[in-house]
């Protein structure tokens, strides 16, 4: 369960407060599948970072009773002067994986990412597409109670995108999901409730179609 209690988030710009949202509250039950909708610039990605505990609210409290992924496919966490294999091992150690678990996860990512010999080369030599494939594979190598998606659910060409889509669908079948997306077909497939953010306010919808209708009319 995730309980968001009266949170406010702002950034100081030139000494002035730029308020993204204030006094937001909602509860997502275990296994809940939540879409975060709204116009650009209203703080959807910031809200995800708050939920993942990457950032903290200026006011209010977020309580979590389950584990949360980092945003699926996030590429900024790699260390460029390590190889793909070394990066995955490093993340495994951060999660206190046993030696046997490390080898299983490394093998999974190596097979899924399909980067060939580059898996044992420095990440700094990768193309952007290769980094994305490695990142998605790493995201899927770990089990979480909630999976977080910030726009990108699949990467690469049509073949690899379908591969990502199929794997995520299987991986998250009985898990919670928190998704920011402008693709309403994807939202319909994976989410059953939504929040709509706009003008520093939050509107919670228990029926996904109601939220999509509002989003479509406002777009």
Where are these predicted regions, by residue range?
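A short, flexible loop at the N-terminus of ABC-type nucleotide-binding domains that lies
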Residues: 1-4, 9-30, 35, 58
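ABC-family P-loop ATPase nucleotide-binding domains
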Residues: 10, 14, 67, 72-158
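ABC ATPase nucleotide-binding domain signature region
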Residues: 33-35, 39-93
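Conserved H-loop
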Residues: 73, 182-189
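Conserved D-loop/post-Walker B switch-helix segment of ABC ATPase nucleotide-binding domains
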Residues: 157-166
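Conserved catalytic loops of ABC-family nucleotide-binding domains
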Residues: 167-179
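H-loop (His-switch) and adjacent beta-strand-loop-beta switch element
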Residues: 190-207, 215
